[in-house]
Amino acid sequence: TVDWSKGEIEREDLLAFYHPATLKKLEALRSWIADRAPLGADCVDPVADWIRMVAINRLSGHSPGFFSGRSMPPNQAVSVKAQLKINEKLGVSPPERDVAGIILKKTKTLLKDGCVPAQVRSSLHTAPAWDLPNIADSSVDLVVTSPPFLDIVQYASDNWLRCWFAGIEPESVAI
């Protein structure tokens, strides 16, 4: 289990998004996940990996179902400066959130039809579409993608908060 008392605020600027107690819990959770499901490891704790996925989905948003105070919709991670402006405009400070409760509630929603079927196999590859040596020819039935909005969307800066939680330096990700 996560020792919630172990969380130390490493980035004070994130207090624009989170109540201090919430941010400490997020830091404790980040550490717990990093110990059990390190990125790039061959063998990770699938429960910790699941919790990371759910937590990243709940980092910021515009309702009490997110860890942050009121922000933009979750697909629009704003900068610290923009979040401070939102807080000032609304006259609010981020409220304390129940990190474990939010993760549990979202997990129940995601698994409302039961567990993920064991036969479902998926893989994530980051490489040019024309060069995927780890995928056998004629073995793919469906590819789901989003069109690149390279002139509109700034993927690294738009995902900075998710990268922080996952322990990824946005500049290190090739886009």
Outline where the language-model segments fall:
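SAM-dependent nucleic-acid methyltransferase catalytic core
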Residues: A21-T145, L150-V153
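Conserved phosphoryl-transfer catalytic core
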Residues: T1-A37, I168-A174
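SAM-dependent methyltransferase catalytic-core segment centered on the flexible catalytic loop
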Residues: T1, L132-P133, V140-V143, P148-I175
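Intrinsic disorder/low-structure terminal segments
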Residues: D3, A16-F17, G65-F66, P148, ...
